[in-house]
């Protein structure tokens, strides 16, 4: 019998044959006398791989061909997959590593593995079965040899490569596909026995005693000892040092401080506080509040005594400085009410003498901090209209009336035609009229005939303050009228002289 070639499996590294034939490798024939192929090839009956498709209607398999049964079956008959041909197993890719040619002699024990010869896959009508012995299977010496020639093995696998183990017949029965390390390299120390695992007890925590801080000073005047050089004893609980409380001592100490409060109280009338034009600049002064009650121990009394002396000295110094450092508003108030008291003192029977008898004031030069536009504080003799209450001077009578209404009488003769709100000044009314969207405002313009009427109204409103507040104003208006008449006569005479000269 002639020597027939045998087949060996070589993978396709580029994967070109995979697209054409559906598998990874191809088989090539090589001459070898050790393997023979039977002259009469074993023919296998071609078995259809795919069964004819059936039309699915309503989830049931209905055959396309006519069956001898009267009606189609209700359910598709169960098909056992194990009863099919063994050729369907060839549809899956082999799980063995790539095989290479080996010159190992044929062993006594060999196994036959059916492999088709045709490169066209499973469509061959007469497949040829070839036998490959297990001795031809060459395991790679290192894990890096597992990779095809086109790929590069990682450097880790190359560095950790070990010599191939010896293969025995008993090992061939086991599908061991990767080299395993020898059992001699097994180290018992690498394993961990769970019985030897023990939980270490935590280290005991040392409990330190709490740090004893000195007690805080209470709010009952204990801070005076530390601030003003009192006797400071060792830090002990306050209960051992505090003496029983005496109600009489508390009242006595408050009575000592009560004298200092009277120095800071200013007895102003209610009209001063209700005046919207006045300002009080007393916020800068420090409020003198009474200290909290203190205990009656001898050491504390010695430390508190110099405090009261210092307070009284400070109050005396402030009393001496108040006339010089008096603000402009306070001077205005003292001058205003001082002039009223002086006017009332001339007439003891007037009702205002009783009303302002409790107020004491002295006339001071009227230096006033004015609000709004900046005005001259010097006494201008050209301002002929003088207010008899605050002795302010004005150039026009309208200015004096406006000042008198806004500050002294608070009369509001100007009323809004839309909402009826009243104002003491006409400019305030014009500004208010812009809210309603109308620029035109009807103002009651005063004529010469209406001056006495307004004067009589002011006299009625101010009758309780002064007997005749507008006597000076009326005399001034008469004098100013005479001056105006004289100036007009002089102008006319000058014109006549010019005409006569011509």
From Swiss-Prot:
GO terms for cellular component: nucleus. It comes from the Eukaryota. One of its GO terms (molecular function) is RNA polymerase II cis-regulatory region sequence-specific DNA binding. Disruption phenotype: Leads to significantly enlarged and swollen the hyphae, with an increase in septa and a significant decrease in nuclei. Remarkably decreases spore yield, spore germination rate, traps, and nematode predation efficiency. Increases the expression of the arthrobotrisins biosynthesis cluster. The keyword S-adenosyl-L-methionine does not apply. Pfam families: zf-C2H2. Keywords: DNA-binding, Metal-binding, Nucleus, Repeat, Transcription, Transcription regulation, Virulence, Zinc, Zinc-finger. It is found in: Nucleus. Its main location: nucleus. The keyword Repeat applies. A zinc finger (C2H2-type) spans 385-408, 414-436. One of its GO terms (biological process) is regulation of transcription by RNA polymerase II. Key downstream transcription factor in the HOG1-MAPK pathway. Plays crucial roles in the regulation of growth, conidiation, trap development and fatty acid metabolism. Negatively regulates secondary metabolism such as arthrobotrisins biosynthesis.Also regulates autophagy and endocytosis. This is C2H2-type transcription factor MSN2.
């Amino acid at each position: 019998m002639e020597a027939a070639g045998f087949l060996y499996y070589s993978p396709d590294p580029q994967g070109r044959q995979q697209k054409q034939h559906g598998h990874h490798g191809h088989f090539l024939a090589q001459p070898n006398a050790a393997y023979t192929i039977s002259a009469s090839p074993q023919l296998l009956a071609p078995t259809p791989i795919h069964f004819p498709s059936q039309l699915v209607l309503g989830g049931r398999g209905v055959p396309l061909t006519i069956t001898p049964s009267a009606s189609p079956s209700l359910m598709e008959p169960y098909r056992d997959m194990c009863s099919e041909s063994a050729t369907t197993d060839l549809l899956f890719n082999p799980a063995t590593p790539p095989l290479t040619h080996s010159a190992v002699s044929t062993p006594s024990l060999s196994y036959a593995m059916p492999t088709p010869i045709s490169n066209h896959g499973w469509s061959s009508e007469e497949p040829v079965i070839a036998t490959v012995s297990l001795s031809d299977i060459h395991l790679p010496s290192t894990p890096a040899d597992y990779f095809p020639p086109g790929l590069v093995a990682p450097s880790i696998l190359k560095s950790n490569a070990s010599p191939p183990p010896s293969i025995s017949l008993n090992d061939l029965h086991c599908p061991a596909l990767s080299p395993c390390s020898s059992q001699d390299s097994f180290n018992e120390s690498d394993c961990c026995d769970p019985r030897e695992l023990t939980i270490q007890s935590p280290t005991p925590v040392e409990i330190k005693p709490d740090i004893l801080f000195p007690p805080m000073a209470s709010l009952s005047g204990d801070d005076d000892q530390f601030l003003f050089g009192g006797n400071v004893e060792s830090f002990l609980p306050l209960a051992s040092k505090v003496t029983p409380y005496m109600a009489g001592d508390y009242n006595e100490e408050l009575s000592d401080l009560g004298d200092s409060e009277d120095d800071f109280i200013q007895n102003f009338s209610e009209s001063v506080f209700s005046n919207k034009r006045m300002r009080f600049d007393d916020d800068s002064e420090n409020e003198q509040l009474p200290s909290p009650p203190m205990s009656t121990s001898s050491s504390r009394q010695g430390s508190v005594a110099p405090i009261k002396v210092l307070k009284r000295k400070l109050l005396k110094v402030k009393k001496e400085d108040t006339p010089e450092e008096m603000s402009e508003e306070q001077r205005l108030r003292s001058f205003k009410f001082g002039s009223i008291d002086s006017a009332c003192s001339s007439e003891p029977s007037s009702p205002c003498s009783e009303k302002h008898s409790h107020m004491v004031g002295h006339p001071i030069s009227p230096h006033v901090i004015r609000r709004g536009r900046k005005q001259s504080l010097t006494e201008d003799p050209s301002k002929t209209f003088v207010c008899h209450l605050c002795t302010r001077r004005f150039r026009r009578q309208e200015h004096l009336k406006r000042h008198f209404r806004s500050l002294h009488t608070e009369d509001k003769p100007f009323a809004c035609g839309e909402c009826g709100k009243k104002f003491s000044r006409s400019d305030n009314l014009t500004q208010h009229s812009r809210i309603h969207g109308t620029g035109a405002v009807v103002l009651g313009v005063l004529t010469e005939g209406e001056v006495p009427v307004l004067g009589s109204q002011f006299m009625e409103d101010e009758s309780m303050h002064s007997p005749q507040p507008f006597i000076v104003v009326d005399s001034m208006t008469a004098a100013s009228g005479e001056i105006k008449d004289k100036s007009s006569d002089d102008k006319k005479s000058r014109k006549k002289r010019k005409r006569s000269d011509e």
